[in-house]
Amino acid sequence: QLLAAGAGAGLSAAFAAPLSSSLLVIESIERFDAPKTAITTLLAGVVAGGVASWMFPTTPYHLINAVSPGLSFWRQAELYILFAAVIAAIAKFYSLIVPFFQRWLPTLKLSVYTKMLYLLIAAYAISLTETNLTGGGEQFLMMQGMDGTHDIRWLGVMILIHFVFTLLSLSSGLPGGSFIPTLVTGGLLGQLFGLVLVQRGVIGYENVSYMMLVGMVAFLVAVVRTPLTVIVLITEITGHFEVFYPSIVVGGLTYYFTELLQIKPYNVLLYDRMFRNHNPEFPEVEGACYHLYVEIMDGSYLDGKEVDKLTLPNNCIILSIRRDHKTLPAAGETLVPGDQVEIEMDAKDIEKLYEPLVSMANIY
């Protein structure tokens, strides 16, 4: 619970968005299965968001002026469907190219220091032309949102540069996040789509920032696959509730298209990569085992159960119990609150059995 609360508090402090930080933990980490953790995370997020708002009263995202286009319902529906389809297609490419770069860059026959030098030179070269485009790129996004360019070609080149730089950064292995770069990419794609609509005479220049905010939602939903978190987050950090309902429509459509395209969430790709690096034989080795450690909570299903009489799914076995700083053999023991139980299972079953086994040891 403290781990989840810390994750939510960090996001809340960064964006001054306590509600979306709690949703992130519930939707992405706990998968709607831990109300006590949700309450803890919400309290931590409210406190962290309150402190952040006290120290930084205003956020730059509030300065974006979002004006809804005056289009008919059906015309807006057509544009949103088209936009969601385009974003889903780009996200599909993104989900394929990022793992490719992450596999390709380490195979280069160069020392780590040489690779980092090349990345440093690339970052410096980009900074000479457009300073705010490096890093997360949020300052560049803010500039475009408040007084953006009308040049589609120039914006397209900037998006391409930011995209390539993000790929190299994510593949370098250096510490850093992907959330802000993804947010910026979505916003710039929304601006580009808006400028194309302006060129076609569909909307006015004053509506481009509106499309930018919707683009943030769409691309984050497509890449991260946490629609509730993203929709609430963009609404919270921008303060533009007029974008809330379009975000629901576009976010829902984008999520549907990503399901059709079978796009794997980026967080899952990162986790799989990290897990493979630490467990290179998993799960290709036939009969490989995985050891899961859970703590028994008071009132849970496993509380008070005798290990010898306990039947676990898919031939899972309790190997040992950690109690009072001592490791005990599981045979003949009765589980009590506070026990840390070691469960052995087939490695191939970890994805489908993890949540059920954790639920048996916890109160949800």
Predicted regions and their residues:
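Cytosolic Rossmann-like ligand/nucleotide-binding regulatory domains
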Residues: D298-D349, L353
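Core mid-bundle transmembrane helix pairs that form the ion/substrate translocation pathway
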Residues: I39, L43-V46, M55-N132, Q139, ...
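Helix-loop-helix hairpins and the membrane-proximal interhelical loops
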Residues: I97-Y205
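Hydrophobic alpha-helical transmembrane segments
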Residues: L2-L3, A38-L43, A77-L82, A89, ...
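Short, non-helical or kinked segments that cap or interrupt transmembrane helices
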Residues: Q1, F15-I39, S172-L189, I203-M212, ...
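Membrane-interfacial segments at transmembrane helix termini in multi-pass membrane proteins
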Residues: S209-L213, V217-Y293
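Alpha-helical transmembrane segments of multi-pass membrane proteins
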Residues: Q1-A9, M158-F163, Q199-A218, I231
